[in-house]
Amino acid sequence: MPAPATYATGLTPLPTPVPKVSKNIMERFSLKGKVASITGSSSGIGFAVAEAFAQAGADVAIWYNSKPSDEKAEYLSKTYGVRSKAYKCAVTNAKQVETTIQTIEKDFGKIDIFIANAGIPWTAGPMIDVPNNEEWDKVVDLDLNGAYYCAKYAGQIFKKQGYGSFIFTASMSGHIVNIPQMQACYNAAKCAVLHLSRSLAVEWAGFARCNTVSPGYMATEISDFIPRDTKEKWWQLIPMGREGDPSELAGAYIYLASDASTYTTGADILVDGGYCCP
């Protein structure tokens, strides 16, 4: 008679073993000795996470597309005594993503943590008023397809290694419909990312974890174009009455990336000032 196994993933024997990690909780939050790869990390949320990871001891691979980030990688190395290097890649190009991930693995020897953070907002207004489908294709290609390419090729490395933590930057927009701005495309893409993560958490259960962080409105350059009267409406809708600072997201990412979360997979952490509560 065959030994019992998990229904979805075929893991056996049961129960599966508990990971051997430090009993000291502060040591479990440390990223010392780990390698983190972060897309869209030349500025905003991505760089805030990259800096937090460096502070926690991780070596960091910074990804950029249009803004060269060698100086930022050098800053992380000199300031925090870690290894950091910048890589140019268009995450909408599957071959570039595959090559970049393989290069990072070669340069650093492994990849412990991957953050799929690159993304763009929808700014075209109500969907049916847009004269063509180019804007839709652009947002979905970056926010969903680009995240998928990263997961596919990072996941292959995680499977080969037998370990890894993958984190998607999703959004509260995957949970609710934003107002007053109309952004059906962005909402749909981020909702898809949430379910992609949960699906991969099951597929990868034997070798890696997969989770999401869902930021609310953050004070970054991605929202610089938003008129003040729109932001005032946001503040009224946010129970805490303000946008978040990117640094306020760092703790969620560090938890999911670290050994403090070895039994956390398929989860989403909302960091939205309470927006989704009412």
Curated annotation (Swiss-Prot):
Optimum temperature is 25-28 degrees Celsius. GO terms for molecular function: mannitol 2-dehydrogenase (NADP+) activity; NADP binding; oxidoreductase activity, acting on NAD(P)H, oxygen as acceptor. It comes from the Eukaryota. InterPro entries: NAD(P)-bd_dom_sf (IPR036291), SDR_fam (IPR002347). Optimum pH is 10 for the oxidation reaction, and 4-9 for the reduction reaction. One of its GO terms (biological process) is protein homotetramerization. NADP(+) binds at residues 45, 117, 152, 186, 190, 220. CDD domains: MDH-like_SDR_c. Gene3D superfamilies: NAD(P)-binding Rossmann-like Domain (3.40.50.720). Keywords: NADP, Oxidoreductase. It catalyses: D-mannitol + NADP(+) = D-fructose + NADPH + H(+). Its EC number is 1.1.1.138. Pfam families: adh_short_C2 (PF13561). The active site is at 171 (proton donor), 186 (proton donor), 190 (lowers pka of active site tyr). It is an enzyme of class 1 (oxidoreductase). Belongs to the short-chain dehydrogenases/reductases (SDR) family. PANTHER family: BENZIL REDUCTASE (PTHR43008), L-XYLULOSE REDUCTASE-RELATED (PTHR43008:SF13). Versatile oxidoreductase that catalyzes the oxidation and reduction of polar as well as non-polar substrates at a very broad pH range. Preferentially oxidizes secondary alcohols. Has highest activity for racemic 2-heptanol and racemic octanol. Is also an efficient reductase for selected substrates. Has highest activities for ribulose and fructose. The enzyme is (R)-selective in the reduction direction and produces exclusively the (R)-enantiomer. Homotetramer. This is Probable NADP-dependent mannitol dehydrogenase.
